[in-house]
Amino acid sequence: ERADSGFRSCASVQTSLVMWPIHALGSPEQKARWLPRLRSGEALGCFALTEPLSGSDPASLQTRAVPDGTSWRLTGYKRWATNGNKAEVAVVWAKAGGDDARSIRGFLVERGQFQARPIPGKMSLRASDSAELILDGAVGEPLPGATGLGAALKCLNEARYGIAWGAVGAATACFAAARDYVKERKQFGKPLGAFQLVQEKLARMYTDIGLAQLSCVQLARLKERSALTPVQVSFAKRAHVAMALEAARSARDLLGANGITLAYPPIRHLLNLETVKTYEGTHDVHTLVLGKHITGLDAFA
């Protein structure tokens, strides 16, 4: 993500939201067929949960799956499917036989069964392939372990872990650009970096990035021991993305008018991070996750 959040989004979806559910929730046949191709990059996959009227409330999704002999037919409309225009397979979430969160199931839908259309006019994540998917009686193969909304949320938790790391990379790129600029740019007869207020901003960015790096290391240690909890991942995703956004804004400020041009990376990272703040659970949603953990009281509804 130090290069661009769009690149990390592509990799994050491929690994956490496509390969992981096939690995953890799929059948032996599904694993054998798809994981080698996805792992090598021969095939791309996408994850289709969000809909035009279902974002932070995924339980309200409207896509339906009905049995048709030995297969299932899916009908619905998905939006913001990263990699969707080039995906060979989509992990699609639909309601099967009911209208509550327990009826949600995950399906593998192959290219040719869905129509993908690019989402135009983006000012953020321009390097990311964002698509809307149209399913009109699409043939879907159920993932045996992907039952209930909780299965979809487990996938998202894997992706959020990667976002917590990636946001630190974006912040580091912004810090490096600002540091190099203020060492060379002169005003009032000396480098900008020689002014106290400039050094204060750099010191704050440096400290915040360092703390987030230490947090990532602790997350990894917990994950290696299978001790990492969804609340800890929400904590890190929320805190690290907010930190990276502030770093991007500070870096843009230190670059002055030059900071609004694409000659320097902070403004691009700033726009990208506005999207990262929203996807895989918005900043406010993760605030409520932490609030429930702290108080034991559910404030979602």
Question: Which residue stretches match the model-derived regions?
Answer:
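Well-ordered alpha-helical segments within folded domains of soluble proteins
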Residues: 14-19
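Conserved hydrophobic/aromatic beta-strand scaffold that supports enzyme active sites
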Residues: 46, 62-64, 89-93, 106-108, ...
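Flexible, small-/acidic-enriched active-site or ligand-binding loops
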Residues: 60, 111-138, 142
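Short beta-alpha junctions and helix-cap segments that line functional grooves
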Residues: 34, 61, 77-79, 118-121
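Alpha-helical interface subdomain recognition
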Residues: 1-2, 10-13, 25-30, 37, ...
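A short core secondary-structure module
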Residues: 71, 75-115
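A short, Trp-centered hydrophobic/proline-enriched beta-strand micro-motif
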Residues: 41-49
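Short Gly/Pro-enriched turn/cap motifs at secondary-structure boundaries
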Residues: 53-56, 80-83, 95-98, 122-129
